[in-house]
Each structure stands twice: as C-alpha cells, then as structure tokens.
Amino acid sequence: MSTQMSVFLSHEVAAPQWGEKALVSFNEQGALIHTGESTDLTKIQRAARKFDVQGIKSVVLAGDGWDVEAIWAFHQGYRNPKKYSQLEWVALEEKAQAELEARIKATEFTRDIINKPAEEVAPRQLATMAAEFIRSVAPEGTVTARIVKDKDLLAEGWEGIYAVGRGSDRTSAMLQLDFNPTGDENAPVWACLVGKGITFDSGGYSIKASNFMDSMKADMGGSGTITGGLGLAIMRGLNKRVKLILCCAENMISGRALKLGDVITYKNGKTVEIMNTDAEGRLVLADGLIYASEQNPELIIDCATLTGAAKNALGNDYHALLTFDQALAQEALKSAAEEKEGLWPLPLAEFHREMLPSNFADLSNIGGGDYSPGASTAAAFLSYFVQDYQKGWLHFDCSGTYRKSASDKWSAGATGMGVCTLANLLVEQANK
C-alpha cells in the first residue's frame, strides 16, 4: 500500500461532516485543500503545515491549479527543519519550473544555515558557506571572494567586528564577495549588500537570560537572508556588479571580551562608547557599511536581526524597513507585495540621530532617554557609517527570520522570509 498522499485543490466548501470551516478533507483519492472561490495561498500554506504536523511524510500535488505560487505556498508550509518529508508536484513549463527550483534552492540555503547549531557555523564557516553558495549559483568566473579574519581585521581597520568577537575562541571574519557578471573588471559596483553575521549571541557582559539566548544561533539570520536574496537574484538573471559583505563574529564572555565603557574608533573616524554589549550587531554592521560606502555604489542594503523593538512592533510576520529614502522604500514595499512577503516601514528621521548621546565618544551604541524607539535609534546609529545615508540606503530589521515555535503557517526555525523580496528588488532596480 502506498504511503504517498495525493493532494488536490478545491474551490468548493468541504462536506458538512468535516466541519463548517474545514480547510482540509479526505476522500478515496487523497486530500482536498478547500481554498475558497479564489485560490487563497495562505490557506494552502496552512493546510501544508497540517499535513506535516499529522506526520504525512510523502505528498504529491495532483490535479488542476498547482501553479508556481500554489506549489511554493505548499512547500513553505510543509517544509520541516528535520527534513524527513518528500514533496512532488505536477509538471510545470520550463520557465516556471526554473523559477520554483530557484526559490527553493535559495531559501533552503537560508533556512538550513540559520537552523544549524552555532557549533557548526562559526564566523569563518559562515563566510565560507555563503561564498560557496553564491559560487554554486553564479555563472563560472563571475565570483571572487576574500575573507578577512582575526588580526587582519585590525590591520585593515575593521575595529567593530574584531572588538565584538575578541571574547570568543572562534575568530571573527569579514566576507568581501564580488559578483561581477559584466566581464569588465573595472565595471562600477552597482550595489553593496551587508549582512549581520553574529553566529551566537550570548549578549556579552550584558548577558541575555536563557529564554532569550536559546535562539541566538539565529542571530546571523541577516547574513543568511541577504546571501539567499543575492543567490536568487543571480538565478533570476541579475546583470550588474554587486558586492556581498558579511560581518561575522561570535559575541561571548571571557577575559578578552568587550566591556561596558570601552570605546571603539572606526575607520571613518567615528568613536562609539559601549553602553550595552548586547547591542553588538550594529557594531559589526558599521564596518560593513563603511566598506560598502567605499565602493561608491548606487544602492546599499543591509539585513540584520538587529532589535527586539522591531519584533515587539511587528511580531514574526513582517520584517521592518527603515530608510531616509522614501522613494526607494516604496520600491522595496512593492517588491515585498509582489512576492507576498511581510515588510512594514518603521520611522527613521533626523532627530533619531540625536538620540545616541555619549559623554566620552561621538556616539553611544544604544539610545538614551525614556521610551527610546529602539529600532529607529539602531538604524540611526547605522546611518553614521553610510556616506550618503539619505539616498540609496535601506535597512531591513529582520523580525520574521526565525520562529522559536511553530505557527499555523510555519514550522519552528528559520522561515527564509525576505529572500524573494530582496531578489525582486535587486533585479527590478538593476533593470531600470
């Protein structure tokens, strides 16, 4: 007897015995997902989650209606970090099949690397894995990569990455990857993508409680997401030169670790007083944004699991978008809508840049005053390291990267959310 479940789409309401609001019913042919008069992709994703929860380990999507978007919705819900399930679908035409496979490949990289234990993804491993993934999807000869590590970071002026990671026995690293499909080594760098790559965040001396620390293997989710986004953009035909910069460190406690009251002097001359060692993501991103600005690109995008404030505002279903460039923000929101991913703007204004006072340095690494808008002040901090921060810079505070427990749409763990939005945005802007 076959253990494979055939799953069909139905616009009809389930028979009464299945319940008034039944999403799934069964007959002699297999299972029916009742999507309503129009095909509701959210219902498909929720139904797929039910199949996984029930332990149905092999599914074939059968019958009519299974286009790219419907299959993609099912895949997202059915996918489990233990990866014991098998999914097959009806034949698609070549272009549609290529698009579906590209999405799956990019998001599988992102979800897998975020879900891995921190013991398996040290800072240098993260940089190496990201470079290997981009090489695997890019045309031959279009990718070069350099990993700056340990004391070489100091020699080249990347003080933030080194300072955050110096408390760990696992050396910090900066990935400088160059994707150049133009064939011209002197082609201008069109965009720079910067990712926060904190492979484990204990909080440092501003230590986290266990119930906040237990998911901190995922604090490199910004790097995982932006790498997946670039990979998907390449598979969709990105034709301009882009640099990927990952700022990788482990935030640990030791006699060498960063201390409260320390001052970091950055390559652009800015000094930063450390008032909270758990606000470390912005310290490593600052180096990446300085390097990005040195390339004089038209577009800078950074991705980071940066603040609890963004998650408190938006929950797990949206990433936060912060920028001074409102026209570019609208383009990003349009890309998210087209890809059916959650993205929501949070405020970022000039006065937020004045909310980082320090008695001993140019800036503090945390906002001051009562009711500090944490996501906004974190983005404001980053703006000091972007040369032209008012134009062409987007900051994604990745609230929806990882779930500690399953929901009705997602398994526990990484979601891959944002990968498709970033790819869409890159390709659309490059083609203008």
UniProtKB/Swiss-Prot annotation:
Q: What is the designated name of this protein?
A: Peptidase B
> What is the species listed in this Swiss-Prot or TrEMBL entry?
Vibrio vulnificus (strain YJ016)
Q: Primary place of residence?
A: cytoplasm
Q: Which Gene3D superfamilies match?
A: Zn peptidases (3.40.630.10)
Annotated catalysed reactions: Release of an N-terminal amino acid, Xaa, from a peptide or arylamide. Xaa is preferably Glu or Asp but may be other amino acids, including Leu, Met, His, Cys and Gln
Q: What is its EC number?
A: 3.4.11.23
Binding, Mn(2+) 1: D201, D278, E280
- What is annotated as the active site? K208, R282
- The answer, when asked if Metal-binding is one of the entry's keywords, is yes
Q: What does this protein do?
A: Probably plays an important role in intracellular peptide degradation.
How many cofactors are bound and how? Binds 2 manganese ions per subunit.
Q: Broadest EC class? A: hydrolase
A GO molecular-function annotation: metalloaminopeptidase activity
User: Which cofactors does this protein require?
Assistant: Mn(2+)
What binding partners and quaternary form does the record give?
A: Homohexamer.
User: Does this entry carry the keyword Protease?
Assistant: yes
GO biological process annotation, one example: proteolysis
Q: Which GO terms describe its cellular component?
A: cytoplasm
